[in-house]
Amino acid sequence: MTFSRLIAAVGLLFLLSAVTQPAAADAFGTKDEAVALVKRAIARTAEIGMDKAKVEFMDHEGKFIDRDLYVVVMAKDGVRIVQPASPKLVGKVFFDAVDVNGKEYGKDVQQIAAGPGKGWVSYAFKDPVSGKILPKEVYIETAGDYIYLAGVYVR
């Protein structure tokens, strides 16, 4: 193989790897995707009921966990029913949540759920990818007897 062919082959491999690798921005969910995930979860619950839906929502190989996006579901009293990132929090009250800066964002979620029924709350949280404390925004929507959330880190 001549040197020019070797360079061409290496260049082609580099180009192909760049095309097949997701862009860094694609590695993380967006606000629009968080809203869409919540809406899909609400529709799925309406279709099959919460008992079956929560199994799907907790399935790390399923359709409701995508990169760093996942859906959290709680009852109207704030008790978590679905929490795939931290299953040990299922059964715990979300409305008591406080971020690392002391912001009581759980109460903000409660106010949106009880008031307009949908909206966004911002707080600081440890990013599991970088290990750093980052701003996070969570979309909240109430449907039926449940409150649905999905959040994104502001990178």
Which residue stretches match the model-derived regions?
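N-terminal membrane-sensor/transducer module of prokaryotic signaling receptors
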Residues: 2-15, 20-155
